[in-house]
Design a protein with these regions (language model features):
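Proline-centered turn/helix-capping motifs that create local helix->coil transitions or kinks
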Residues: 29, 123-127, 200
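Short, solvent-exposed loop/turn and secondary-structure capping segments
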Residues: 33-35, 126-130, 204
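Active-site helix/loop module of the DD-peptidase/beta-lactamase fold
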Residues: 48, 71-122, 152, 179-205
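Short, contiguous, pocket-lining structural segments
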Residues: 142, 160-168, 180, 184
Length: 205
């Protein structure tokens, strides 16, 4: 493994990554684990006890929680999310006609399947030029605000017709809370963290 570790450390250094805690595991063992510390960042806290933001790695967790909850509550995967979150029915579809952004009504109910598969019509501002333009014009709140305001961004296509990386998992989080009556973090602990003994894993409050 020495040559492999040397290779990945060289790669991390070329990419100017400050710190990496890495490992290779199977279902029952750890075959490799290591730490990469970039000497260009000597003041950065670099230890295995620090917490990391998981960013979009929270999506698989949210997907698992969604499927577990749908199973517990006997909710069909293709049922409309609007049954539990009426506000999602208010999202319109944005499109461009020349240089003008226009809107039309969405007549296709957004299902749990649409949200899970990123085919709901939701898009991130850094993935879709139309949403990016709306953010730049201050017609849509930017994601960096860190609140739910960006969920009000319009759809960019009819649900089920295309694929786009976007805020559909934000809507799933809200649906999980609406169905269960408890927070997303409480659901995470109930279905995943407690059964697996994960004591330092949580969603941000």
């Amino acid at each position: 493994m020495d040559s492999f570790e040397k290779e990945i450390n060289t790669t991390f250094l070329k990419l100017n990554i400050p710190f990496v805690d890495y490992g290779i595991t199977s279902s029952d063992s750890i075959s490799l684990e290591g730490l990469f510390r970039n000497p260009e960042f000597p003041n950065l806290s670099q230890n295995r006890n620090q917490l990391f933001r998981m960013a979009s790695m929270t999506k698989p967790l949210t997907a698992y929680l969604t499927l577990a909850l749908l199973d517990d509550y006997r909710i069909d995967l293709h049922e409309s999310v609007g049954t539990y979150l009426p506000e999602i029915n208010n999202l319109k579809i944005a499109y461009k006609e020349g240089d003008t952004i226009k809107y039309k009504k969405n007549d296709v109910p957004i299902s749990f399947h649409h949200l899970l598969s990123c085919t709901s019509g939701n898009a991130y501002e850094h993935h879709d030029p139309l949403v990016s333009e709306l953010v730049s014009k201050k017609e849509v709140a930017p994601m960096k605000n860190g609140d739910d305001a960006f969920l009000k961004a319009p759809l960019v296509f009819t649900p089920g017709s295309h694929w786009s990386y976007g805020v559909s998992y934000g809507w799933l989080g809200k649906a999980i809370e609406a169905i269960s009556g408890i927070t997303l973090d409480e659901n995470l602990k109930k279905y995943l963290c407690n059964p697996l003994g994960l004591k330092q894993t949580s969603f941000n409050p």
